[in-house]
């Protein structure tokens, strides 16, 4: 059983895409977006339920919808979508800050653990 949090808080991070983030095609190397998505999912989950000890359980498909090039500024967002018994689902997406074009979408499931085992979340 899951429920949607009463207060929907959206988290935001703004990044300048520097040369060290680029692949051999001059576009953003996908692993950086994946790392930032994981960071943002953790932040959203942990700020929504501060008493939890979250780890990443899984990610949905990483959908890169448009290229990000050096010098672009992107905004990455995360938001708790639903909260279950031991975990929560976080949506993560990014847009080009100058053009507002979608560049990336995914979701993460963050699970509350103690001693390596999933444990129930305290309801907020």
Which residue ranges define each predicted feature?
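Short alpha-helix capping/helix-loop boundary micro-motifs
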Residues: 59-63
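A structural signal for short, hydrophobic beta-strand segments that form beta-sheets
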Residues: 56-57, 80
């Amino acid at each position: 059983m899951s429920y949607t949090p009463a207060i929907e808080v959206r988290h935001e991070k703004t990044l300048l895409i520097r040369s060290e983030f680029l692949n051999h095609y001059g576009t953003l190397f996908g692993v950086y977006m994946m790392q930032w998505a994981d960071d943002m999912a953790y932040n959203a989950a942990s700020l929504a339920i501060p008493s939890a000890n979250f780890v990443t359980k899984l990610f949905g498909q990483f959908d890169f919808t448009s290229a990000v090039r050096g010098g672009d500024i992107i905004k990455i967002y995360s938001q708790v979508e639903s909260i279950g018994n031991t975990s929560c689902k976080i949506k993560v997406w990014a847009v080009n800050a100058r053009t507002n074009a979608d560049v990336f979408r995914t979701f993460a499931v963050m699970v509350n653990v103690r001693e390596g085992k999933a444990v129930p979340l305290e309801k907020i």
